């Protein structure tokens, strides 16, 4: 079994670091001339996968936009996952789950067990019930060679009230975000060429005093239409092992499959130059 970190390292070398988010919200479906229903969802999502999945290292479906249509939406998500992986892309399912005990284990089984129809290469998780609450998901990821991306420094304006808070008993008065990165540093300590446990750090946070070098990947949402530039990525993440700038709107608003394909190929070339 090849760990997620090793597979991601190879995918970035082959295709480039760009991660494309698949976020079929109602406004975007309307822009495509599609109905805000399961049929519109399916047409949109599968056309995007066909256009870009053979050319990017990672696709990131946002589960909530599929879940809102109930079981039929989940069935579309299952097809998105399967077809993306068949095209050679790694699937990072954006679910941001976080719970304790048996519930945490159930989430792990749903998204990381290869026998599940929702099985993905990696998922996003929330550590704010305490990093140890993620232990069942961490161990399941290890067992199946999957990856995790842990929320650390998000770019939403509400994030700092939790993520910048100082933690009692941490040397130097470290922050919650810094503590999350320390945990990831330990999880990835022996991994080569790249750890499987990553962090979510917004491309638009401006600056940070936190050490982003932890031998694991960084998912950097906010790249492109949300304001993050290639210069921002290089300035903010220069010390990080592998950064995945994540773009959704810049790609999805293009609509034409050939234009989407050319855009992601060109962006990957620019990110690697």
UniProtKB/Swiss-Prot annotation:
Keywords from the named record: Decarboxylase, Lyase, Pyrimidine biosynthesis
Pathway: Pyrimidine metabolism; UMP biosynthesis via de novo pathway; UMP from orotate: step 2/2
Domain of life: Bacteria
The keyword Lyase appears for this protein: yes
This enzyme's EC code(s): 4.1.1.23
Top enzyme class: lyase
Xref: InterPro entries: Aldolase_TIM (IPR013785), OMPdecase_type-2 (IPR011995), OMPdeCOase_dom (IPR001754), RibuloseP-bd_barrel (IPR011060)
GO biological process, one term: 'de novo' UMP biosynthetic process
Catalysed reaction, written as an equation: orotidine 5'-phosphate + H(+) = UMP + CO2
Any Pfam family the entry gives: OMPdecase
Catalytic site: 96
One of the record's GO molecular function terms: orotidine-5'-phosphate decarboxylase activity
Family per similarity comment: Belongs to the OMP decarboxylase family. Type 2 subfamily.
NCBIfam families, alphabetized: pyrF_sub2
Protein name: Orotidine 5'-phosphate decarboxylase
Organism, scientific name: Nocardioides sp. (strain ATCC BAA-499 / JS614)
